[in-house]
A protein has these predicted regions:
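ATP/Mg2+ or Mg2+-diphosphate-binding catalytic cores
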Residues: 73-76, 80, 187-234
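A general structural signal marking secondary-structure boundaries and capping sites
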Residues: 24, 44-52, 96, 146, ...
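Glycine-rich, phosphate-binding/catalytic loops in enzymes
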Residues: 34, 123, 140-142, 159, ...
Length: 234
């Protein structure tokens, strides 16, 4: 799944990986290609089905609670409307935890640029945030980062599952699309509070929140939430 690791020093935190010949770092435009989407779906399925486990867990709701605690201690104001969206998201928390999937080894930060395509397969790189997690998180987060259309999501998920995704699978992926934007909203506010100079993280956080709110208020969202609430066998 990853580029071959040639050397890793756990004490220094340094790693050397083999160069990916003919590798192209993916971007939003590249993922509009059906063949690339198929290879990407296969890559994430290979990761999730590898049979190994990371040493740490990626706990979405614990992370949200931790970020909120940090921001409360810092006395940082949240973007306008965040509290209302957070309250509304409790429905998602209840639905997702009512029918949990077994945790799998997940990337947890599937930026489009963390995927490298050599024309034959897609490699997934940069496992800084990796942990054991609901595999639908990776699919939902990549959909957000790749600005997928519904058609792209269908192609990607069909490649991932090897068959047409069920309403439960699609619904779960959509729930994580909303939740990843909610989580990264808080992450952005933390970066802003710490005066991270790399980017305008306040604007980043506001944009994430607005996208989350737009998705959760869309006409199709209740259908997806209902599919998750009913469970995988309905």
């Amino acid at each position: 799944v990853n580029a071959e690791i040639i050397h890793f020093d756990i004490d220094r935190g340094t790693m050397v990986s083999r160069y990916i010949d003919n590798g192209i770092t993916l971007d939003i435009a590249a993922l509009k290609d059906e063949a690339v989407l198929n290879r990407t779906g296969h890559a994430f399925r290979q990761l999730h089905d590898c049979g190994q486990a990371f040493s740490g867990e990626f706990e979405l709701f614990q992370q949200i609670d931790q970020y909120l605690s940090v921001l409360n201690e810092l006395g940082v104001e949240l973007p306008s409307g965040y509290t209302e969206v957070q309250k509304d998201a409790e429905r998602l928390r209840t639905a997702l935890t009512s029918h949990p999937l077994p945790n799998r080894p997940c990337h947890c930060d599937p930026m489009v640029e963390n995927c490298v395509d050599n024309g034959k397969k897609v490699f997934i790189i940069d496992f800084e945030y990796a942990g054991n997690n609901d595999p639908m998180w990776d699919l939902g987060d990549l959909s957000v980062e790749g600005d997928f259309t519904e058609e792209q999501e269908y192609i990607f998920m069909t490649a991932y599952f090897g068959h047409e995704p069920t309403p439960f699978d699609v619904g779960r992926m959509v729930m994580y699309k909303a939740m990843c934007d909610l989580l990264w909203t808080l992450w952005g506010v933390v970066q802003h509070a710490n005066n991270n100079p790399v980017d305008d993280f306040w604007t980043y956080a506001v944009d994430r929140l607005n996208r989350c709110r737009t998705l959760m208020s869309s006409a199709e969202f209740p259908k997806h939430l209902s599919a998750v609430q009913r469970g995988p066998n309905e």
